[in-house]
Structure formats: structure tokens, C-alpha cells
Amino acid sequence: MNYNFGGNVFDQEVGVGGEGGGGGEGSGCPWARPCDGCRAAPSVVYCRADAAYLCASCDARVHAANRVASRHERVRVCEACERAPAALACRADAAALCVACDVQVHSANPLPAITIPATSVLAEAVVATATVLGDKDEEVDSWLLLSKDSDNNNNNNNNNDNDNNDNNNSNSSNNGMYFGEVDEYFDLVGYNSYYDNRIENNQDRQYGMHEQQEQQQQQQEMQKEFAEKEGSECVVPSQITMLSEQQHSGYGVVGADQAASMTAGVSAYTDSISNSISFSSMEAGIVPDSTVIDMPNSRILTPAGAINLFSGPSLQMSLHFSSMDREARVLRYREKKKARKFEKTIRYETRKAYAEARPRIKGRFAKRSDVQIEVDQMFSTAALSDGSYGTVPWF
């Protein structure tokens, strides 16, 4: 461990070595606290765990003995009086001071004192050096991207024949270094960003058109499937056709983007309608009278605003189930209910056989001992009943 902290830097402020020091002008602190270990060298650190002032050699010898001793907290000795542990560090003077010396030194100066804990001086120094080196490396790397010193030096070496050539080369090198190179860099950045934006916009448009085409194809396939099922199982009147007609009529009024958003909203809405209808039809004995479409103020929000999809008179009609359809559905439900089979299956045959063989008392299962007790009671009661007639003992 290296504890070379240098000499005292507060001789003039505290009065050491001159007027109030009591020692020579060129000498250090003659009253520095000696090391508690060797009693020969001045102490440089203070160990709080051992409550001892140690020099650099004694500190290395004592605290390097084992791991427990190496974990002891140690602080520097005050650089002004060299007789007390340092409590804080002054950034302006780059020195560690105890409380008394801090008050004595900074009370004479009207400037505000900037102090930090003494234990964090070393950590802050390491962090500061790392950040400074990192900033310098990044700055050097950034300027290396724009450097053309090798090209400029080659031009200057090849064109040193006369003064005119030197002037021309110097002008061209200056232009290339300070103007042409920077302008070229910024122009390229602007052009590249503009070109990249144009390419991204074109790709987004092509991707959007492709998505619109896929959505239209999916919607057409869904319409075909619903049209095929409409004659056999669909109970609600055809809503897909009405919605598609209104979509085609709306395409001529609004733009392509609004039309695409409207088709997406309609497809989502039709999916919800089909789900609600299929769920209601599966319920036993419950036939809904109307669907969500009966609400007159149902709207679909699009980026262009709220568009009323059911403002036309054809869609405002109440979608009630006809009586024939209701009767057919009820009859079909009853037929399915009659066709249900409820068969009793014996899960454990051995248990059934054992239950049939077990003894019972008044219909309930009984243990073997209980049966024997009951039989004994029956015989005892029979004997008592026989004794009521009277028996003559024979000797």
C-alpha cells in the first residue's frame, strides 16, 4: 500500500514554519504525530478499528496480515496539523483536513467552502480519470472520420517546385480540410436522410396497398362462405351484402385511406355479429329476438371521424326472427333432446359385488361384529320369552 501523500500545503495559512509555527521556515511539521507502531516515522493514516495512527510501512504490515485486518476502515491524517484524522477534503486546495483545521483555514477566506467526505476522494479521482480518457478517445475517433492529413501531406510533398504551386496546394488543402470536407459530410448526411425517407415512404405505401388487397380478398371469401351457409343455417337476414353495398357507395365519396379503414371496421363488426349469433344459437331453449344491430346509434370510429354505417333506411329495419324459423329451431332442439341417451354404466364391478355381499341391518351396511351382537340379542330374547312359561329346576 502506497501512502505517499506529499508534504504539508497549509504552512502559510495555519501559521506553520513562520509566525505561529514555532519551527523553521524550510522545515516541515516538527510536531507531527509519530506512528503508534514503530514510534519513529510520522503517521499518515488513522485506523478507526484499531484506533491507531500508523505510518505507511506499519499500515502495510499490520493490515496485510489477514483478510479481516485488510477490511479495516482507514482515513488520512490531517495535512495541516498532522495530529488528527481527516474529516473532509477541500477540492480547491486538494487536501484532507480535520474539523479544527477546516474551520481555521476557511474562516479567514470569505469564499464559500466546497467540501466532500474524505473517504470518497479516491473513488471520485478514479471516476474522473476514466471519464476524461473516454471523452478524449471519443473525440479523437470522431475527428479521425474527417481527417485527410495523409492526402494533404502527399499533395504538399509533390508540389514544392515553386511558390505558386505551394500557394495553390495550401489553398486547396485548406479548402479540402475546412470547407470542402465538412460541406461534403453535411451534404451527404442530408441527401442520405432524404433519400432514406423517400424509400421508407414508398415501402410503407406499397405495404399498405398490399394489406388492403389482402383484407379485401379475405372479406370476399367470408362473404362467399356466409352466402353459402345463408340458405341452410343462417337465421339472421343477410347483413354482409348490405354492408358491402354501403362500402362500395362510400368508396366514391371518401378517399382510399378512409375506405380502407372503413372496410377494416366493418369486417371487425361483422365478425362480432357472427360470433354473437353463433353463441346465441347454441344456447338450449333460448332464441334471441334481436341482435346488436338494432341499436340506431351504433357507430364505428375511423381516423377521419365517426361515420354512421346504419343511417340508411334498409339497415334500420328490426332484425326479428320469423315465426317459422323459431318453430323449426324449437322442433330441432326437442328432437335432439329426445335422442339423448342416458345409460347407466357400472364403473367398478368389484365394488358392486362386494356391496351386494355385505351384511345389512335395516338396509344399511353393518360390520360382522355388529351382526353377531344382533344375533346374540335375538337368541337371548327368545330364551327369556321361553322362561315366562315357568320351569321347575331339577336337582
UniProtKB/Swiss-Prot annotation:
The record's subcellular location field reads: Nucleus
Q: Describe the subunit structure.
A: Interacts with HAL3 in the dark.
The UniProt entry's GO biological process terms, in alphabetical order, are: cell differentiation; flower development; long-day photoperiodism; negative regulation of DNA-templated transcription; negative regulation of long-day photoperiodism, flowering; positive regulation of short-day photoperiodism, flowering; regulation of flower development; regulation of photoperiodism, flowering
* Residues the record lists as binding Zn(2+) 1: C35, C38, C58, H63
This protein's GO cellular component annotations are: nucleus
Arranged from A to Z, the UniProt key words for this protein are: Developmental protein, Differentiation, DNA-binding, Flowering, Metal-binding, Nucleus, Phosphoprotein, Repeat, Transcription, Transcription regulation, Zinc, Zinc-finger
Q: Where is the CCT domain?
A: 326-368
User: Which species is this UniProt entry from?
Assistant: Oryza sativa subsp. japonica (Rice)
Misc remark: The GIGANTEA-CONSTANS-FLOWER LOCUS T (GI-CO-FT) pathway to control photoperiodic flowering under LD is conserved between Arabidopsis and rice, but the regulation of the downstream gene by the upstream regulatory gene is reversed in the two species. In Arabidopsis, GI acts as an activator of CO, which in turn activates the floral activator FT under LD conditions. In rice, GI activates HD1/CO in a similar manner to that in Arabidopsis. However, under LD conditions, HD1 suppresses HD3A/FT expression, causing the suppression of flowering.
Q: Which InterPro entries match?
A: CCT_domain, CONSTANS-like, CONSTANS-like_Bbox1, Znf_B-box
The ranges of region (Disordered) come to 147-176, 208-228
PTM comment for this protein?
Phosphorylated by OSK4 in the presence of HDR1.
Per UniProt, what is one GO molecular function of this protein? Answer: zinc ion binding
**Family statement:** Belongs to the CONSTANS family.
Its name, as the record gives it, is Zinc finger protein HD1
Transport among keywords? no
| Entry function | Probable transcription factor involved in the regulation of flower development. Required for the promotion of flowering under short day (SD) conditions and the suppression of flowering under long day (LD) conditions. Positively regulates the floral activator HEADING DATE 3a (HD3A) under SD and negatively under LD conditions.
The B box-type zinc-finger regions cover 30-72, 73-117
